[in-house]
Amino acid sequence: LTAFGCRTATFFRIAIAGFLLAAVGETVSPVRSLADSPITRENARPGGTDWILTDPADHEVEGYASATSIQRGDKLHFYIHSTDPRITVAIYRMGWYAGAGARLVQGGISLPGVRQPMPSADPVTGLIECDWQVSYTLNTATDDPGEWLSGVYLAKLTGTSSGKQSYIIFTVRDEARKA
Protein backbone atom coordinates (compact mmCIF):
# COMPACT_ATOMS: atom_id res chain seq x y z
CA LEU A 1 0.00 0.00 0.00
CA THR A 2 1.09 3.55 -0.62
CA ALA A 3 1.35 6.07 2.21
CA PHE A 4 -1.96 7.54 1.01
CA GLY A 5 -3.57 4.09 0.98
CA CYS A 6 -2.33 3.34 4.51
CA ARG A 7 -3.66 6.67 5.80
CA THR A 8 -7.00 6.09 4.10
CA ALA A 9 -7.28 2.57 5.51
CA THR A 10 -6.36 3.85 8.98
CA PHE A 11 -8.94 6.65 8.69
CA PHE A 12 -11.68 4.18 7.77
CA ARG A 13 -10.75 1.84 10.63
CA ILE A 14 -10.94 4.73 13.09
CA ALA A 15 -14.23 5.94 11.60
CA ILE A 16 -15.77 2.45 11.81
CA ALA A 17 -14.54 2.00 15.39
CA GLY A 18 -16.01 5.39 16.31
CA PHE A 19 -19.32 4.50 14.68
CA LEU A 20 -19.49 1.17 16.51
CA LEU A 21 -18.65 2.80 19.84
CA ALA A 22 -21.34 5.43 19.29
CA ALA A 23 -23.88 2.80 18.24
CA VAL A 24 -23.37 0.58 21.27
CA GLY A 25 -22.27 3.24 23.72
CA GLU A 26 -25.63 3.29 25.46
CA THR A 27 -25.72 -0.46 26.00
CA VAL A 28 -22.19 -0.99 27.30
CA SER A 29 -21.96 -1.15 31.06
CA PRO A 30 -19.61 1.36 32.64
CA VAL A 31 -16.13 0.05 33.31
CA ARG A 32 -13.42 1.40 35.51
CA SER A 33 -11.22 3.89 33.71
CA LEU A 34 -7.63 2.84 33.04
CA ALA A 35 -6.61 5.93 35.02
CA ASP A 36 -8.14 4.26 38.10
CA SER A 37 -5.92 1.21 37.73
CA PRO A 38 -3.15 0.89 40.33
CA ILE A 39 -0.77 -0.20 37.56
CA THR A 40 -1.60 2.83 35.41
CA ARG A 41 -1.08 5.17 38.37
CA GLU A 42 2.20 3.42 39.19
CA ASN A 43 3.51 3.65 35.62
CA ALA A 44 2.65 7.38 35.56
CA ARG A 45 5.10 8.01 38.41
CA PRO A 46 8.55 9.39 37.59
CA GLY A 47 11.23 6.82 36.91
CA GLY A 48 14.92 6.89 36.23
CA THR A 49 17.65 5.18 34.29
CA ASP A 50 19.86 4.19 37.25
CA TRP A 51 18.57 0.63 36.80
CA ILE A 52 20.67 0.22 33.64
CA LEU A 53 23.95 -1.64 34.10
CA THR A 54 26.93 0.61 33.38
CA ASP A 55 29.67 -1.93 34.18
CA PRO A 56 28.30 -5.48 33.77
CA ALA A 57 29.96 -8.09 35.96
CA ASP A 58 31.84 -11.11 34.74
CA HIS A 59 31.23 -13.19 37.90
CA GLU A 60 32.53 -10.43 40.25
CA VAL A 61 29.02 -10.01 41.65
CA GLU A 62 26.12 -12.32 40.79
CA GLY A 63 23.14 -13.89 42.42
CA TYR A 64 19.80 -15.58 42.22
CA ALA A 65 16.50 -15.54 44.11
CA SER A 66 14.76 -18.32 46.02
CA ALA A 67 11.85 -18.02 43.55
CA THR A 68 11.29 -16.38 40.18
CA SER A 69 7.75 -15.33 41.11
CA ILE A 70 6.26 -14.50 44.49
CA GLN A 71 2.87 -13.45 45.78
CA ARG A 72 2.68 -9.85 47.06
CA GLY A 73 3.32 -10.03 50.79
CA ASP A 74 5.78 -12.93 50.58
CA LYS A 75 9.46 -12.95 51.43
CA LEU A 76 12.15 -13.58 48.84
CA HIS A 77 15.69 -14.73 49.62
CA PHE A 78 18.64 -13.47 47.59
CA TYR A 79 21.77 -15.60 47.29
CA ILE A 80 24.68 -13.38 46.24
CA HIS A 81 28.31 -14.07 45.41
CA SER A 82 30.78 -11.20 45.36
CA THR A 83 34.53 -10.74 45.14
CA ASP A 84 34.01 -7.21 46.53
CA PRO A 85 34.10 -6.77 50.31
CA ARG A 86 30.76 -4.88 50.18
CA ILE A 87 27.87 -4.71 47.75
CA THR A 88 24.76 -2.60 47.39
CA VAL A 89 21.35 -3.79 46.30
CA ALA A 90 18.73 -1.54 44.72
CA ILE A 91 15.27 -2.84 43.79
CA TYR A 92 13.54 -1.45 40.70
CA ARG A 93 10.07 -2.07 39.30
CA MET A 94 10.03 -2.23 35.51
CA GLY A 95 7.37 -0.17 33.75
CA TRP A 96 6.67 2.80 31.52
CA TYR A 97 7.65 5.62 33.90
CA ALA A 98 7.61 8.26 31.14
CA GLY A 99 9.95 6.16 29.03
CA ALA A 100 12.62 5.70 31.73
CA GLY A 101 11.88 1.97 32.00
CA ALA A 102 11.96 1.52 35.77
CA ARG A 103 11.48 3.15 39.16
CA LEU A 104 13.54 2.68 42.31
CA VAL A 105 11.31 1.11 44.96
CA GLN A 106 13.92 0.20 47.55
CA GLY A 107 17.54 1.27 47.74
CA GLY A 108 20.32 1.77 50.20
CA ILE A 109 20.73 -1.92 50.95
CA SER A 110 24.39 -2.42 51.87
CA LEU A 111 25.64 -5.95 52.47
CA PRO A 112 28.95 -7.61 53.14
CA GLY A 113 30.34 -9.30 50.05
CA VAL A 114 30.47 -13.07 50.41
CA ARG A 115 32.44 -15.44 48.22
CA GLN A 116 30.03 -18.30 47.72
CA PRO A 117 31.32 -21.78 46.79
CA MET A 118 31.60 -22.66 43.11
CA PRO A 119 28.89 -25.20 42.26
CA SER A 120 29.91 -28.53 40.83
CA ALA A 121 28.01 -31.02 38.71
CA ASP A 122 26.44 -34.07 40.32
CA PRO A 123 28.41 -37.03 38.92
CA VAL A 124 25.26 -39.13 38.37
CA THR A 125 22.69 -36.62 37.10
CA GLY A 126 24.89 -33.78 35.88
CA LEU A 127 22.72 -31.34 37.86
CA ILE A 128 24.56 -28.19 38.84
CA GLU A 129 23.07 -26.72 41.99
CA CYS A 130 24.29 -23.74 43.98
CA ASP A 131 24.28 -24.35 47.70
CA TRP A 132 24.80 -20.73 48.70
CA GLN A 133 23.88 -19.08 51.96
CA VAL A 134 21.18 -16.40 52.04
CA SER A 135 22.65 -12.92 51.66
CA TYR A 136 19.46 -10.87 52.03
CA THR A 137 15.74 -11.42 52.57
CA LEU A 138 13.33 -9.05 50.84
CA ASN A 139 9.96 -8.63 52.55
CA THR A 140 7.11 -7.46 50.31
CA ALA A 141 4.51 -7.38 53.12
CA THR A 142 2.79 -4.00 53.28
CA ASP A 143 -0.54 -2.42 54.13
CA ASP A 144 -0.02 0.21 51.42
CA PRO A 145 -1.93 -0.85 48.28
CA GLY A 146 0.48 1.26 46.19
CA GLU A 147 3.56 -0.72 47.20
CA TRP A 148 4.84 -3.96 45.67
CA LEU A 149 2.36 -3.91 42.81
CA SER A 150 2.37 -6.86 40.47
CA GLY A 151 5.09 -6.65 37.88
CA VAL A 152 8.66 -7.47 36.97
CA TYR A 153 11.36 -6.32 39.37
CA LEU A 154 15.14 -6.09 39.14
CA ALA A 155 17.49 -6.31 42.08
CA LYS A 156 20.57 -4.47 40.85
CA LEU A 157 23.71 -5.73 42.57
CA THR A 158 26.76 -3.44 42.60
CA GLY A 159 30.21 -4.19 43.99
CA THR A 160 31.18 -1.09 45.96
CA SER A 161 34.90 -1.19 45.16
CA SER A 162 34.87 -2.67 41.63
CA GLY A 163 31.64 -1.02 40.45
CA LYS A 164 30.71 -4.29 38.71
CA GLN A 165 26.96 -4.87 38.40
CA SER A 166 24.43 -7.60 37.72
CA TYR A 167 20.72 -8.32 38.16
CA ILE A 168 18.49 -10.71 40.00
CA ILE A 169 15.14 -10.71 38.20
CA PHE A 170 11.86 -11.65 39.87
CA THR A 171 8.12 -11.15 39.49
CA VAL A 172 5.59 -10.05 42.08
CA ARG A 173 2.01 -11.31 41.63
CA ASP A 174 -1.12 -10.02 43.31
CA GLU A 175 -3.71 -12.76 43.05
CA ALA A 176 -6.09 -10.81 45.31
CA ARG A 177 -6.35 -7.91 42.86
CA LYS A 178 -9.16 -8.08 40.34
CA ALA A 179 -7.97 -8.10 36.73
What residues fall within each predicted segment?
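Low-complexity, intrinsically disordered regions enriched in charged/polar residues
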Residues: 5, 14-18, 166
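Intrinsically disordered low-complexity regions specifically enriched for long asparagine
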Residues: 4, 22-24, 74
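N-terminal secretory signal peptides that target proteins for export/translocation
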Residues: 1-10
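Extended, solvent-exposed regions of the mature portions of secreted/cell-surface glycoproteins
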Residues: 28-179
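Bacterial N-terminal signal peptides
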Residues: 11-26
